[in-house]
Amino acid sequence: MTGRFAPTPSGRMHIGNVYAMLGAWLSARKSGDSIRLRIEDIDEPRVVPGAAETMMRDLEWLGLGWDDEPVFQSSRHALYQEALELLSKLSFDEISDIISTGSNDSKPCSTTAGNEAATSEATPLIYPCFCSRADIRAASAPQEGDRFTVYPGTCRRLIASEPQRAKQRLANNDRHSMRIATADTTITFHDEVFGTQQYNLAHDIGDIIVRRSDGIYSYQLAVTVDDLDMGITDIVRGRDLLRSNALQIYIRKALINAGFKPSEPTQPFHPADGSNKPDDVTISYAHLPLIDNAAGQRLAKRERSLDLGILTAHGATAQQIIGYCAWLLGLQGDLKHTKPQPMSADEALGVFSWDAVRTNTSDRTLDQGEFNAYSDCRPYSAVLFCSFILQLYSAIAFSQSIIPNQADIR
């Protein structure tokens, strides 16, 4: 199996990033497997110059090494365009039939089909969307917790009922994004932390953007293409991406059946027919609990969590940071009855198991008393350390920026 780090270089890494990256590193190394580094810099306006290089130095300092050369999304535009063109050749009916019959894999997930709308025959798998954000906000109710807004299907109906009107708008160069039509199908998969998960694509997710109106490929398309192309089979990230996982399984199946050829194909564990199709493999998914503030909300990036540069400037060591993240993962015992202890990444590897992580699947909540107790072993003041703790959790799933932003899901 192959794991991956997938940070976004929009600034210096926070402890929240390290928490998720440690989980990914431990999962891969515990099985003796490789782990790749992918810099998710496709949304170039958000990239901070030099952040990727600093991020790599920080990972090495923490003892979280990776295998092979880093991969940069910014150098893979041609690959994403190729993937989009392949998907565009499929009709909605074709992929709906494929998804409803399941796959040849060794059961990382399964699908259950529902009843499709009467207009599905006229719907391409990839279609243009002319809706503005305001249009979608007015017609949709946001889903709780993970920022998904289910698209109401306005342009999908337009293309089915008035195809000439849609073609004319394209001919007029009207600003538009590109969406993928989702089937009335339930995706079921096993998560190492949260167990069996089920999401209906049409009702829980909807038709999501795969290329934005500014020409930038969406997170959902890029990460699915990358994981498939790089042979990633061990995916660890925050639980706010559970719903995205179902969507990415759908896109992955569509890509495979459209003829996408990975540059680093995975080898099947137990191929039924001797084939090397990329859907013959088992993929391991693990989504980590999030960390909330005292109000039960994730801290926003605008609250300026302290980064590793500030922490190291005030004396924090790699062992202290790794130890704290290992404690958050549940690797040092019950969070309610233990306090964190410094440890190296290799020491954390010695005690890592998913059983320990899944012992407590609740989101972690800031507790001032626990943090004050931990400050007793810090080489800098308790006041400074408490300030550090209160701000360090603005990012959890490899940074907030990998969570599908509103431009990606509308």
Spans of model-derived segments:
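N-terminal Rossmann-like or analogous alpha/beta NTP/dinucleotide-binding catalytic cores
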Residues: 1-144, 240, 244-260, 269, ...
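Short C-terminal domain-edge/linker segments immediately following a structured domain
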Residues: 66-70, 210-214, 252-255, 316-324
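Non-catalytic terminal extensions that flank enzyme cores
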Residues: 1-10, 35, 95-102, 107-121, ...
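Charged/polar, solvent-exposed surface patches and flexible loops
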Residues: 57, 82, 86, 138, ...
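Short, functional N-terminal and low-complexity linear motifs
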Residues: 20-27, 48-54, 212-219, 287-294, ...
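Active-site cores that bind ATP or allylic diphosphates and position pyrophosphate for catalysis
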Residues: 102-123, 133-264, 269-300, 307-312, ...
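Exposed alpha-helical structural elements
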Residues: 79, 135, 150, 320, ...
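Short, solvent-exposed secondary-structure boundary motifs
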Residues: 17, 199-200, 408
